[in-house]
Amino acid sequence: MLKIIIPTMMLMPLTWMSKPNMIWINTTAYSLLISLISLSFLNQLGDNCMSLSLLFFTDSLSAPLLALTTWLLPLMLMASQFHLSKEPLARKKLYITMLILLQLFLIMTFTATELIMFYILFEATLVPTLIIITRWGNQTERLNAGTYFLFYTLVGSLPLLVALLFIQNNMGTLNFLMIQLWAQPLPSSWSNTLLWLACMMAFMVKMPLYGLHLWLPKAHVEAPIAGSMVLAAVLLKLGGYGMMRITALLSPLTSFMAYPFMMLSLWGMTMTSSICLRQTDLKSLIAYSSVSHMALVIVAILIQTPWSYMGATALMIAHGLTSSVLFCLANSNYERTHSRTMILARGLQVLLPLMAAWWLLASLTNLALPPTINLIGELFVVMASFSWSNITIILMGTNIIITALYSLYMLITTQRGKYTYHIKNIKPSFTRENALMTLHLMPLLLLSLNPKVILGPIY
C-alpha cells in the first residue's frame, strides 16, 4: 500500500518546489503515474501478501474505489487550470496541496484495516474539502454551503464513533478481517436497533439518503470544479463503502431494520429525479441526479445479496466517472458564459461542435446506455431488487424513465435551440478539455469489456 501512499505524500513538496511554469505539468504527470500504479491492485488474488499489512489492506471492494480516487487527481488538476489562471502563485500551490491532501486521506480511508482508523480518516476528509469549497467557491453562498456540508456530516457521524467504541469494548477488536470471523449475530432489541441506526446514519448522510441530502446540492453548486468532481466521484462513495464494510457487524438485524430506509430510498430516487426536471441551474441538476443514483446504491446494499453487492460496486464506480465528466462539461460552459443557468447558455452545438459530442456521450452514459458500465450496475441493482420484491420495479422503472428524460432535457437545453447573442464570441474547446473528457469516458467504455475487476468482493 505504501507504494501509493508515499508517492502521493511526495507530491506536496513537488508542488512547492516546482518552477511556476511547471506546476501543472509536474503534478499532473506524477499523479497520473500514481494512478497507473494503483491499477495493479485491481483483479488480484485475495490471499497475496502484497495487499495486506497491519495498517492498510486492499481487497476487491476497496481496490476499484482506490483506483477511482487516484485516477481522479490528475483529472481534477487538468480541470482546474483555467479556473486558477488568474490566482497568485502561492494560492495555486495551496489549492493543489489541498487536493493532494484530500487524495491522501481518501486513499488511506479506503484501505484502512481498523474501523476507528477508518472513522478518523473519514472525518479528516472533511477539512480539505471544506477549505476547497469555502476558499475557492464562486459565490458568497459558499460559506452557507460549507456550513451545511460540515454539520450534516459531523452530526451524522458522531453516533458512529460512540457505536464503534461500544463494539470495540464488546468484541475486543475492530479489525475488518477479524470482524468477518468473530461477529456475533445481533438479535433485534431496542438497544441493538439504536446501535444499528448509529452505525448506519453516518453513511446514510454521506451517501446521501433522501431527506438527509440537503447539503449535497448546496455543496456541489458552490464548490469550484475540482471540489465538485471529488465530492461527486469519491466522497459519496465513502458512504457506500462504509455501509458495505459495517454490515458484516450487523448481519441479521439489517434485514429487519432495512425496510423503512429502502422505502425512503426508492421514493427519494423517484423524487430527486423529478426535481431534476425542474432545475434551471446546470450544476444543481447534476447534483440532484447524483442523489438519485446513490439511492439505487443504498437500496442495493440494504438488500444484501451477492448480486446486489456487485451491482452497487459497479454503479458506484460508474457514477463516479459519469457525474465527474458532467461537472467538467458544466464547468467548461461556465468558464465561457459565466453563468450556470441553462437558458442563458443554450445553442452551444453551433459554436462548440466537439463539446456537443462530449455532452451527448456524457448524457447517454448518465442514462445508462449500453455498452457503458452504468448499464451493468443498474441492471444488476434492478434485477436484485426485483427478485427481493416485485413491487420495487414500479418505482425503479419510473426512475429509469425520468433519468432518461432529465438527461435528454439537459442535453437539449444546453446544446440545441437558438444561441443567445452574448455568447457569440466564446473561445473554442481546448485540447486540455478534450483530453479530460476522453480520460473520463474511456474507462467507462473499457470497463464494460472486463467488468469483473470492479464487481466487488463477491464476484
UniProtKB/Swiss-Prot annotation:
Protein name: NADH-ubiquinone oxidoreductase chain 4
Location of the protein in the cell: Mitochondrion inner membrane
InterPro entries assigned: NADH4_N, NADH_Q_OxRdtase_chainM/4, NADH_UbQ_OxRdtase, ND/Mrp_TM
Quaternary structure, from the entry: Core subunit of respiratory chain NADH dehydrogenase (Complex I) which is composed of 45 different subunits.
Catalytic activity from the UniProt record: a ubiquinone + NADH + 5 H(+)(in) = a ubiquinol + NAD(+) + 4 H(+)(out)
EC assignment: 7.1.1.2
Domain of life: Eukaryota
A Pfam match: Proton_antipo_M
Single GO BP term: mitochondrial electron transport, NADH to ubiquinone
Membrane topology term: Multi-pass membrane protein
Protein task: Core subunit of the mitochondrial membrane respiratory chain NADH dehydrogenase (Complex I) which catalyzes electron transfer from NADH through the respiratory chain, using ubiquinone as an electron acceptor. Essential for the catalytic activity and assembly of complex I.
Record flagged with keyword Nucleotidyltransferase: no
Gene Ontology CC annotations of this record: mitochondrial inner membrane
Bridged cysteine pairs (disulfide): none
Transcription regulation among keywords: no
Provenance organism: Halichoerus grypus (Gray seal)
Gene Ontology MF, one: NADH dehydrogenase (ubiquinone) activity
Transmembrane portions of the chain: 22-42, 60-80, 98-118, 147-167, 194-214, 224-244, 255-277, 284-303, 308-330, 350-370, 391-411, 435-455
Family: Belongs to the complex I subunit 4 family.
Broad enzyme group: translocase
Main localization category: mitochondrion
Signal peptide: none
UniProt keyword annotations, A-Z: Electron transport, Membrane, Mitochondrion, Mitochondrion inner membrane, NAD, Respiratory chain, Translocase, Transmembrane, Transmembrane helix, Transport, Ubiquinone
